[in-house]
Amino acid sequence: MNGNGTADKPGPPGGKPFGPGMGPPIQYPTGFKLYSIMTGLYLASFLTALDRTVLVVAIPQITDHFNSIDDIGWYGSAYLLTFCAFQLLFGKIYSFYNPKWVFLSAVLIFEIGSAICGAAPNSTALIIGRAIAGLGSSGIFGGSVIITFFTVPLHQRPIYTGIAGVIFALASSVGPLIGGGFTNNVSWRWCFYINLPVGALTVVTILLFLNLPPARKAGTPLREQLLQMDPLGNLCLIPGIICLLLAIQWGGSTYAWSNGRIVALLVLAGVLLIAFVGVQLWLQDKGTIPPRVMKQRSIAAGMAFTICVTAGFMSFNYYLPIWFQAIKNASSFHSGVMMLPTVISSGVASLACGFIIHRVGYYTPFMIGGSVLMAIGAGLLTTFTPTTEHPKWIGYQVLWALGCGMSMQQASLAAQTVLPKPDAPIGISLIFFSQSLGGSVFLAVDDSIYSNRLAAKLGSIPNLPQSALTNTGATNIRNLVAPQYLGRLLGGYNDALMDVFRVAVASSCACVVAAAFMEWKNVRAAKAAGPGGPGGPGGPGGPGGPEGLRGGNKV
């Protein structure tokens, strides 16, 4: 251990000096320095995960404050559009510039967006702030994993990946509780202001403790740097993603799917995304997504797996609380408490699997086994009825959440394992792009199924207009009908929610198929290879090596 809190790495076997092209060994931070860096990263990750759910219970007060009922959809969509659209561009930026400064820039953008939201004088300013915060989040989300990639040895990363899974599950579940606490006791503006001091703490810890080698752009002319960012590809990708998400957000709710606006958006999205694929095939390694990375077996399977597991996670995370509120007459706060079996089980499974993978090295068995548990648990959750008692809704949650916790984080670990270090930021960004896009698409699918099935099931109840179903919260549905129709009302809500849960069953089964295509790679193999080995410190594709991320070679 040296005086800087980093571990000194030994030279090649036999005590020989590092040979030509091997480069010096990398020094990973240890002890207090490492823990400080990871704390900063976890705080930033917590904020981005929290920001996606904390606003849910605050929206009614915001719309009352600004008299902006027509803008409700934009409070979530503005954040989501920039969050998804810029994920892959940030991956390219991380692969070319020093991740420390890219990450800090993303945190600063997120903080600016949060400050604008908190101080917003009108609804338009709030929407702009949400879009800026989403842009910052797109760099934080994958950036925290990319920095972990450069600060933690591969064989130890499963532990930190497991902790990240706990953070994500906790933030996603407690967001509505925190939002409700601020909204009811202080002000909805504190749903955004809380990000400022926590984000500042992240900035301080990363500034003080994270030190990375010089960026690959050193000595590269500015024009060449801009060309490395694939401007043509991103001019196709970013508008294409925005058009796709707008069509998904508006289709079936604001406008009919056959409406000219939706059709035009879908056609434009298709044309732009096809053009993006063409640009990537033309540019090859100089593109935003090198085709060889996309064709890597574990990356392709990992993206499919991530889309499917996120679909199930979002379905239950959003609609299971609605079941508790509508069917079990739970308050918003109490429904959050009733979700604790999911939070605790997924967190424990994620952390335990991290330690086990650290010991045994293989992550693929946990993806396969976790997918099977998810499929079984999701299937059992579709058996809920208005009379289902707590032993079942607790036990079925636990079974599904254990599978989710076992498997959800492993695709990003696979990207770090199978790719050489120059490609790792791109691979990690692809996984997180799949997560954000999959969640967005399937939430829209769930919402369409839920709304249509609810209207079909409850349309025959006397004196129950369609507007009452869409404008009444789940906690107040019992006030919509006379007592003699309450059973039909609850049965209709239950049936509509079970149809949504069946989407999660299908996606969980698809996870099993995707996981079966993952390669069986051992994260401990890189440790055994030692410094100078392929992908290892000082070796080809490794930090300090001739083809490493910091090596200065052109892409």
Curated annotation (Swiss-Prot):
CDD domains cross-referenced by the UniProt entry: MFS_Azr1_MDR_like (cd17502)
A Gene Ontology cellular-component term: endoplasmic reticulum membrane
Residue ranges of the region described as Disordered: 1-20, 528-555
Disruption phenotype: Does not affect the production of viriditoxin but leads to a sporulation defect.
Membrane-crossing segments per the record: 30-50, 71-91, 101-121, 132-152, 162-182, 190-210, 232-252, 262-282, 304-324, 337-357, 364-384, 393-413, 425-445, 497-517
Regions of compositional bias (Gly residues) in chain numbering: 530-555
Presence of the UniProt keyword Glycoprotein in the record: yes
Glycan-carrying positions: 4, 122, 185, 329
Keyword Cytoplasm included in the entry's annotation: no
Domain of life, per lineage: Eukaryota
Compartments reported by the entry: Endoplasmic reticulum membrane
PANTHER family associated with the record: MAJOR FACILITATOR SUPERFAMILY, MFS AFLATOXIN EFFLUX PUMP
Family: Belongs to the major facilitator superfamily. TCR/Tet family.
Protein name: MFS-type transporter VdtG
Species the sequence originates in: Byssochlamys spectabilis (Paecilomyces variotii)
Gene from which this protein is expressed: VdtG
